[in-house]
């Protein structure tokens, strides 16, 4: 039975999106997991805690005996059924626990007794995690071009269309602004970093990559922060700035934040609840920058937002949102971005409309 235990093996697993049956407890999985992993634990959180306490008080033999006692009979059979189904569904997969120790070996031996030979990751999640961290450090050393521009400039789409682009906001499940949340919850910090490492490894493996194309992000994207090694390299990177007409930016923002988000919320929750979630999403975004807008201006824009939502609900038109979106861009977002860009003006190497920047990046 082949087992994976070298750095290259670990990288190959991440590049291939090899299915990983992660037998750690749910609390461990939630703290950090690999992108292609599914959590089918040997022990649940309470069982793991009990075994851990027993280990500290009575030693390894007593803890092992307790573990076998807790995971027995119908409980063991239910978990065996889940592992067996996952193995059959993912014949190229691999088992994983925290460090490649007893848990994955126990599950492997039980599966073997049931007629299923399934490999495991020697070193477990810890080894994969260290591989992900090291890969990011190494790959971040390649040259980087950042795509900058005011809100609504289509930066994310431009990055997505580059073969050497990595969509940081897509990986973080957040668009990086007060209105940036998506319907997908953000990953834990470790899981986000693992996903980023896997994406960089896959992108690098597909081609003879000379440089990265990334969006000009701040350190935080929602609740996730960029790995320091990558963030440091981004502060030194060249910047290409998209400068599209204001009207085109408004069209993009209308599509992204009003039409698409309304569709996504109603698709996920149904018409009535979806509408309420959509309204709450917009109000939450505006409320997040209340202090910077000042109370009076915030109240004015919030009233315009309410009026726009009433119009959208009764007519289906999103045009009313321009009454609060335009001043929000002109008074807050655009001045803020231009101020930030001025501080790194020496890094700007190209300016142009979206298509011009895309062509410039393609020629790098």
Curated annotation (Swiss-Prot):
InterPro entries for the chain: Rhodanese-like_dom (IPR001763), Rhodanese-like_dom_sf (IPR036873), SelU (IPR017582)
Entry keywords, A to Z: Selenium, Transferase
Broad EC category: transferase
SMART domains, A to Z: RHOD (SM00450)
GO terms for biological process, alphabetical: tRNA seleno-modification; tRNA wobble uridine modification
A GO term, aspect molecular function: transferase activity, transferring alkyl or aryl (other than methyl) groups
EC number: 2.9.1.3
Active site location: 97
Record's catalysed reaction(s): 5-methylaminomethyl-2-thiouridine(34) in tRNA + selenophosphate + (2E)-geranyl diphosphate + H2O + H(+) = 5-methylaminomethyl-2-selenouridine(34) in tRNA + (2E)-thiogeraniol + phosphate + diphosphate; 5-methylaminomethyl-2-thiouridine(34) in tRNA + (2E)-geranyl diphosphate = 5-methylaminomethyl-S-(2E)-geranyl-thiouridine(34) in tRNA + diphosphate; 5-methylaminomethyl-S-(2E)-geranyl-thiouridine(34) in tRNA + selenophosphate + H(+) = 5-methylaminomethyl-2-(Se-phospho)selenouridine(34) in tRNA + (2E)-thiogeraniol; 5-methylaminomethyl-2-(Se-phospho)selenouridine(34) in tRNA + H2O = 5-methylaminomethyl-2-selenouridine(34) in tRNA + phosphate
Occurrences of domain Rhodanese (ranges): 14-137
Family: Belongs to the SelU family.
Complexes and interactors: Monomer.
PANTHER family: TRNA 2-SELENOURIDINE SYNTHASE (PTHR30401:SF0)
Protein name per the record: tRNA 2-selenouridine synthase
Species this protein is from: Escherichia coli (strain K12)
């Amino acid at each position: 039975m082949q087992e994976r235990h070298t750095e290259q093996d670990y990288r190959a697993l991440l590049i291939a999106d090899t299915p990983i049956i992660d037998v750690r407890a749910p609390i461990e999985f939630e703290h950090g997991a690999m992108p292609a992993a599914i959590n089918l634990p040997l022990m649940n959180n309470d069982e793991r805690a009990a075994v851990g306490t027993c280990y500290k008080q009575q030693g390894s033999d007593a803890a092992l005996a307790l573990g076998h006692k807790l995971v027995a009979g119908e409980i063991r059979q239910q978990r065996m059924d889940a592992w067996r189904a996952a193995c059959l569904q993912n014949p190229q997969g691999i088992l994983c626990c925290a460090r490649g120790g007893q848990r994955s070996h126990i599950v492997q031996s039980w599966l073997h007794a049931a007629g299923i030979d399934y490999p495991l990751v020697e070193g477990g999640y810890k080894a994969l995690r260290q591989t992900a961290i090291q890969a990011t450090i190494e790959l971040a050393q390649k040259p980087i071009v950042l795509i900058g521009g005011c809100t609504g400039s289509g930066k994310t789409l431009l990055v997505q269309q580059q073969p050497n682009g990595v969509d940081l906001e897509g990986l973080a499940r957040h668009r990086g602004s007060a209105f940036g949340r998506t319907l997908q919850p953000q990953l834990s910090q470790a899981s986000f970093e693992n996903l980023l490492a896997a994406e960089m490894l896959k992108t690098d493996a597909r081609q003879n990559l000379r440089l990265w194309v990334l969006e000009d992000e701040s350190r935080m994207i929602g609740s996730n922060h960029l790995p320091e090694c990558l963030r440091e390299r981004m502060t030194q990177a060249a910047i290409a700035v998209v400068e599209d007409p204001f009207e085109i930016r408004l069209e993009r923002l209308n599509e992204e934040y009003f039409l698409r988000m309304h569709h996504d919320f109603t698709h996920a929750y149904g018409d009535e609840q979806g509408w309420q979630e959509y309204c709450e999403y917009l109000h939450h975004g505006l409320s997040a920058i209340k202090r910077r807008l000042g109370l009076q201006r915030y109240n004015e824009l919030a009233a315009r937002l309410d009026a726009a939502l009433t119009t959208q609900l009764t007519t289906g038109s999103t045009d009313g949102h321009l009454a609060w979106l335009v001043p929000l861009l002109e008074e807050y977002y655009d001045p803020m971005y231009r101020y930030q860009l001025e501080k790194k003006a020496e890094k700007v190497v190209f300016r142009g409309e979206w298509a011009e920047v895309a062509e410039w990046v393609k020629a790098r």
